[in-house]
Amino acid sequence: MAAGKARIGHLAPGFTAKAVMPDGQFKDISMSDYRGKYVVFFFYPLDFTFVCPTEIIAFSDAAEEFRKIGCEVIGASVDSHFCHLAWTNTPRKHGGLGAMKIPLVADTMRSISTDYGVFEGGMRASPTGGLFIIDDKGVLRQITINDLPVGRCVDEILRLVQAFQFTDKHGEVCPAGWKPGSDTIKPDVQKSKDFFSKQQ
């Protein structure tokens, strides 16, 4: 599967861009800064919208859970870093983000969202809700792109990262709905019977 220049099993498109950091400062960050860690990189259409703050706040609130497993979360939209800062300075009860624990990238030139296949131009002036899981070697492992009215599930994203990390470490594969501690499958015709023999 591919989205723009982003292709499963290949290095994720690199970038350097201005971001609002958790301390409220502006900083240029690059995807290469995160090599050695897993990354959840998600796009949302615009600041000061409706579903977006619920997603971003949920990712921010879960940032420590991701960090515990060696994963960083980065959000991005086509708004400026000044707009991002204004949104983080707006109270949540007024539709703002409040204090953030994750960086928000300003893709004002739309080059990053184009490379990741979530910005197509035309009538839609903002990116779709794309989410990308990138492993510690910088390789793209998962792509999800959805329309805007429905928010994403942070718990499911955390589960997917844990599953990819498990397969990387142990060489076994994870069945549907796998969670840490549950059974996995040895990718071998004979050895896989250990798993399937337990099924009802």
UniProtKB/Swiss-Prot annotation:
Q: Which UniProt keywords apply?
A: Antioxidant, Disulfide bond, Oxidoreductase, Peroxidase, Redox-active center
UniProt keyword Oxidoreductase, yes or no: yes
Q: Where is the Thioredoxin domain?
A: 6-166
Q: Which domain of life is it from?
A: Eukaryota
Q: What is its EC number?
A: 1.11.1.24
Q: Which Gene3D superfamilies match?
A: Glutaredoxin
* Job of this protein: Thiol-specific peroxidase that catalyzes the reduction of hydrogen peroxide and organic hydroperoxides to water and alcohols, respectively. Plays a role in cell protection against oxidative stress by detoxifying peroxides and as sensor of hydrogen peroxide-mediated signaling events.
Q: What does the sequence similarity comment in the record state about its family?
A: Belongs to the peroxiredoxin family. AhpC/Prx1 subfamily.
The protein's name in its UniProt record: Peroxiredoxin
